[in-house]
């Protein structure tokens, strides 16, 4: 007999949407909200003049700049399932947030712009996802615009991303000639209409006109010549691409391919049904002790994200926790493993972008949030008492650095608080040099500095300037010998700093400097990442 807990597990799907910027990530997320009847119209980025913003872009800065800069957590009920979506920033300057999110999901939906094919950001994200053996479902978007040949796109996926493709949906032409899609597994053609209004749930309108591949109705709708060409193309596709195999997909070696237009909500319903039918329910996560299975009785979960000032009126900080095992119950006692203390949260939330809802129960796969007291950090584990720690939530060595100066020097204490909170949520990295009181910011991309300056101004009323500093890169320092580490510290004080978690860091002024110090101290470990 299936228990309530097992049933709850089977009915959950937790995934990240990943893509290159402007491939349609936020638009697709909103169509999920639309189809799940969470919203009635979508506020697309281009509608900013009418004060309609993307629902998943909830921060003021996101609305102002028209881009996603932080991961949005969204829970949607759909066809008796509960879908947990993490809509990640597409911009490469916010890649750290995306990398952390990949540790909290069970699979990914990858969006590919049909006009551009595989892009640089996509390559990097898929490399990380496949390193974790994360299953990938592919949605090729914007078929109603000028696009590459579908077979060319699939060739790019197979060659550049080294993953086998299995088409579920196949398009009838593309761009201005786009006529619709064919579902290979139910043998039905669905016709496309350019009259469809964006932002309205028109799924049913598409389904009114359907026919089988060999139906004469297809010849009448798209023309005999095109219909015959399309039938031959489908025959070719079926002969050269692998049939869908769920086992190979779950091993991350095969990706099912869906085509459509997220903006027009065309083909999105088939993607959503594929997620329900084939994507994994919550899976195990590795800890320092063992694999933790989702069906275990006792609660466990880890913090993969902290967001400061979700509610500016209350200056709150929200910790986002992926539940790995057990069941969360209202006011249950949780053990904060790192600080060795029990806590009881009076309010625990689920999310739809910037909106939050108090919940009383939650299961593995769910993303819950609670108000974060200052001792909660990214990577922290919560259990019912077991002393374990989940792996895989690192900080990466920044690529750009800036020195901070205050417009008003009397706000130093306030600045430290603001930067500490922003660094704890992963918006920026902060380093404090050994030999002075300066503060150095580290980022993956320059836009991160702009965002931090803006958020300090809006959320903390602090005004800062940033200046270039002579730092090429940083490495986190460790050694198996305390004496060796002590000697290294004494001899290199001017090049050392502490990060926000008081981990020792070496500040390299150049690539040559880094190579020299590494060769001079062979017993010192220079780490590119640091586990939270």
UniProtKB/Swiss-Prot annotation:
Domain tr-type G: 10-283
UniProt keyword Cytoplasm present: yes
Cellular compartments annotated: Cytoplasm
One Gene Ontology CC term in the entry: cytosol
Record-linked CDD domains: RF3
Gene Ontology MF terms in the entry: GTP binding; GTPase activity; guanosine tetraphosphate binding; translation release factor activity, codon nonspecific; translation release factor activity, codon specific
Protein name stated in the entry: Peptide chain release factor 3
Main location: cytoplasm
PROSITE patterns linked to this entry: G_TR_1, G_TR_2
UniProt similarity note: Belongs to the TRAFAC class translation factor GTPase superfamily. Classic translation factor GTPase family. PrfC subfamily.
GO annotation terms (biological process): regulation of translational termination
Lineage: Bacteria, Pseudomonadati, Pseudomonadota, Gammaproteobacteria, Enterobacterales
Positions bound to GTP: 19-26, 87-91, 141-144
Gene3D superfamilies for the chain: P-loop containing nucleotide triphosphate hydrolases, Peptide chain release factor 3, domain III, Translation factors
HAMAP family referenced in this protein's UniProt entry, alphabetically: Rel_fac_3
Gene behind this protein: prfC
Function statement: Increases the formation of ribosomal termination complexes and stimulates activities of RF-1 and RF-2. It binds guanine nucleotides and has strong preference for UGA stop codons. It may interact directly with the ribosome. The stimulation of RF-1 and RF-2 is significantly reduced by GTP and GDP, but not by GMP.
Keyword vocabulary terms for this entry: Cytoplasm, GTP-binding, Nucleotide-binding, Protein biosynthesis
Keyword Protein biosynthesis in annotation: yes
């Amino acid at each position: 007999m299936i228990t309530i807990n097992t049933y709850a597990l089977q009915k959950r799907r937790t995934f990240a949407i990943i893509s290159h910027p402007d491939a349609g990530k936020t638009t697709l997320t909103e169509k999920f909200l639309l189809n799940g009847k969470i919203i009635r119209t979508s506020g697309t980025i281009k509608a900013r003049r009418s004060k309609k913003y993307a629902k998943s872009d909830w921060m003021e800065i996101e609305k102002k700049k028209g881009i996603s800069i932080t991961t949005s957590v969204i829970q949607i009920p759909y066809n008796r399932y509960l879908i947990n979506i993490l809509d990640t920033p597409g911009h490469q300057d916010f890649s750290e947030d995306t990398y952390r999110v990949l540790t909290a999901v069970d699979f990914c939906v990858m969006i590919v712009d049909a006009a551009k094919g595989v892009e640089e950001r996509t390559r990097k994200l898929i490399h990380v996802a496949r390193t974790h053996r994360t299953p990938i479902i592919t949605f090729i978007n914007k078929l109603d615009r000028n696009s590459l040949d579908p077979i060319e796109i699939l060739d790019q996926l197979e060659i550049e991303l080294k993953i086998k493709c299995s088409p579920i949906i196949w398009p009838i032409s593309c761009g201005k000639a786009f006529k619709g899609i064919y579902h290979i597994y139910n043998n039905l053609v669905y016709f496309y209409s350019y009259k469809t209004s964006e932002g309205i749930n028109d799924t049913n309108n598409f389904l009114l006109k359907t026919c089988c591949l060999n139906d004469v109705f297809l010849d009448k709708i798209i023309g005999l010549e095109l219909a015959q060409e399309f039938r031959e193309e489908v025959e070719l596709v079926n002969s050269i691409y692998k049939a869908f195999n769920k086992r190979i997909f779950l091993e991350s070696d095969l990706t099912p391919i869906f085509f459509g237009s997220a903006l027009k909500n065309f083909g999105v319903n088939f993607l959503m049904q594929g997620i329900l039918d084939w994507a994994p329910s919550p899976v195990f996560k590795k800890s320092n002790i063992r694999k933790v299975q989702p069906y275990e009785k006792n609660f466990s979960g880890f913090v993969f994200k902290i967001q400061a000032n979700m509610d500016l009126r209350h200056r709150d900080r929200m910790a986002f926790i992926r539940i790995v095992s057990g069941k969360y119950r209202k006011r249950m006692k949780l053990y904060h493993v790192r600080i060795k203390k029990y806590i009881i949260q009076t309010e625990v939330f689920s999310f739809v972008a910037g909106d939050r809802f108090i919940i009383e129960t939650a299961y593995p796969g769910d993303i819950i949030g609670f108000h974060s007291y200052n001792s909660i950090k990214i990577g922290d584990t919560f259990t019912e008492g077991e002393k374990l720690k989940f792996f895989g939530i690192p900080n990466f060595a920044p690529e750009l650095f800036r020195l901070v100066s205050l417009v008003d020097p009397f706000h130093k204490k306030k600045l430290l608080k603001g930067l500490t909170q922003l660094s704890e949520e992963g918006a920026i990295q902060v380093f404090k040099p050994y030999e002075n009181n300066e503060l150095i910011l580290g980022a993956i991309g320059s836009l991160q500095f702009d965002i931090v300056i803006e958020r300090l101004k809006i959320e903390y009323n602090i005004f800062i300037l940033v200046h270039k500093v002579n730092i090429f890169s940083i490495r986190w320092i460790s050694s198996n010998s305390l004496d060796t580490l002590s000697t290294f510290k004494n001899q290199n004080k001017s090049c050392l700093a502490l990060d926000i978690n008081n981990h020792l860091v070496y500040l390299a002024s150049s690539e040559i400097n880094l190579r020299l110090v590494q060769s001079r101290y062979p017993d010192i470990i220079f780490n590119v990442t640091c586990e939270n």
